[in-house]
Amino acid sequence: MAVYTDVAAEELADFLKAYDIGELLSYKGIAEGVENSNYLLHTTSGSFFLTLYEKRVAIDDLPFFLGLMGHLATHGIVCPQPVRTRNGETLGSLAGRPAAIIDFLEGVWPRKPNVAHCAAVGAALAKLHLAGRDFSMRRANALSVWSWRPLFEQAGACADTVQPGLHDFLKAELDHLEARWPQELPGGVIHADLFPDNVLFLGDRLSGLIDFYFACHDFFAYDVAICLNAWCFEPDHAFNVTKARALLGAYHRERALSEAEQAALPLLARGAALRFLLTRLVDFLNVPAGALVKPKDPLEYVRKLRFQQRVGGVRDYGVAILGPVA
C-alpha cells in the first residue's frame, strides 16, 4: 500500500456521506507498497481502508477485483469485503481517482516470517485457488510472460545504472523463459501478489489475505512460485528449505500439485522472479517526485533469480516429489 494522491479532510468527509459508516474521526496515509493510494480511516462506526486506484490498475478491472473479494469472503476465505454505498455501489470517485472503501481486518503482517507462517500461507493459497473455481468473472494476467519484454524495453536502457551488466542478464533470462514457458497447466483465479505484507496474522494464526489488485487467471503453480520467492528467502538472501517444505507441503495437502506442476515449478519460479524484478526496476526508476512511497529494491530479485536459475527440481526446495494426498 502507498500514497500517491493526497486527499483533503473536507473532500473525504463529503465522499463518506454516501456510506453508512458513521462520521470521519481521523485518517492517515499508509506508505507501503507501490500500486495504489491507501488510507486508514477511523469513523464513529469503526475502522476502514480507503483505496484510490492509480498506475497499473485499469478502471475496467475494478469490478473483477471487488467482486472477487466478495466471492472469496463468502466462500470461507478471510479477506476484506468492499463496503457498499447506500445506493449499493462498491466504487466511487475521490480526488479525481476511482475509490473504494474496504473492510478493516485485524492483524499485522509478519516482518520476519517463520515456518508456521509459511505453512499457513501455503494452506491459505490452496484454499483460495479452490474457492475461486466458480467465480464467474475472468481477467487475464496482465503481467504474465508476454508482458515482460515490454517492461524490459521500458527499463532496460537504464538497467546498468542500477547494476552493471543488468541489461544483458535480463535479456538472456527473458529469451530463456519466452522459449520455454509452459502452455498447459492447471489454472484459475490466482492472487499473484501474496507477499508477507499482503497477509495478516494474529500470532501464528492467519487472520486475513489482502490486496487483490493483481488477481487474475493463470497457472496455480505460478502463484505458488511467487510465494516461494516471497516467503522462503532469509535476510542474508539464503533460501530456507524448511520454510519451502512447510509452504509446499501445506499447499499440497489442500490442493494436490500434479507431477507436471511440480516439474514446472523451478521455471515458474524463475519467471516469477523476473516479473517482480522488472516491475520493481520500472518503479525504482520512475517514482513520482514527493510521493509518500518506499520503492522496493529490484536487486533483491536479481539475487532470487540467480538462485532459481540453479534449481534442478523440487528436491532443491526441500521436498521429494509430492505424491497423492490421502
UniProtKB/Swiss-Prot annotation:
Its EC number is 2.7.1.39. GO terms for molecular function: ATP binding; homoserine kinase activity. Transmembrane segments: none annotated. Pathway: Amino-acid biosynthesis; L-threonine biosynthesis; L-threonine from L-aspartate: step 4/5. It comes from the Bacteria. One of its GO terms (biological process) is threonine biosynthetic process. The keyword Kinase applies. Keywords: Amino-acid biosynthesis, ATP-binding, Kinase, Nucleotide-binding, Threonine biosynthesis, Transferase. It holds the Pfam family APH. Coiled coil: none annotated. It is an enzyme of class 2 (transferase). It catalyses: L-homoserine + ATP = O-phospho-L-homoserine + ADP + H(+). PANTHER family: AMINOGLYCOSIDE PHOSPHOTRANSFERASE DOMAIN-CONTAINING PROTEIN (PTHR21064:SF6), AMINOGLYCOSIDE PHOSPHOTRANSFERASE DOMAIN-CONTAINING PROTEIN-RELATED (PTHR21064). NCBIfam families: PRK05231.1 (NF003558), thrB_alt (TIGR00938). Belongs to the pseudomonas-type ThrB family. This is Homoserine kinase. It comes from Nitrobacter winogradskyi (strain ATCC 25391 / DSM 10237 / CIP 104748 / NCIMB 11846 / Nb-255). The lineage of its organism: Bacteria, Pseudomonadati, Pseudomonadota, Alphaproteobacteria, Hyphomicrobiales.
